Amino acid sequence: MKKLVFKAMILAFVVIGSISTIGCKKEDGVVTPVTLDETNQQLVDALFSVSNLDLTGYNDSEVYVMNSNDDLWQLVGDMNIIIPEVDFEKYSIVWGYVVVPHTGYVLSSMELSVSNGNYTMNVEIFKGETGFQAITNRVFWGVYPKIEEPISLNVSYIYVIE
């Protein structure tokens, strides 16, 4: 069930990302995600089969930049998964997760920005009214024009006022 929810969330990001365009330079502002239509479902499957990371407990939230198939294999770590061909000469995959203390938290937006050559992934988490107390995580990812620099993660929580 958890995998199904994660896949649905990523599918929503893919659909949102499909209206994006290519052509971002290293200027200050928002970095637009790229959609690779023929590989999206394989990428979703691969990025949600991540087996080399311990995403349980009180781990910090993380963000990774993948610039090669080797990077992608290190993250996925499962030889039974089909890894799509991604042109890593042109693109990078940004993958991350945010640890949340409640199952009702929903990833409401993500935005990669660059300022003075420094990249930041801004993730907004919305706390819905339903759910229960449990340490869990919310996964996010996107395909972007080539990124060589590390990315810092900024997480904002939006709470429902009752």
Which residue stretches match the model-derived regions?
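N-terminal processing/targeting junctions
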Residues: 17-19, 64, 150-151
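Extracytoplasmic electrostatic interaction patches
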Residues: 101-162
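N-terminal catalytic cores of peptidoglycan-degrading enzymes
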Residues: 25-86
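Bacterial Sec-dependent N-terminal signal peptides
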Residues: 2-4, 17-44, 156-162
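Mature extracytoplasmic domains of secretory-pathway proteins
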Residues: 62-120
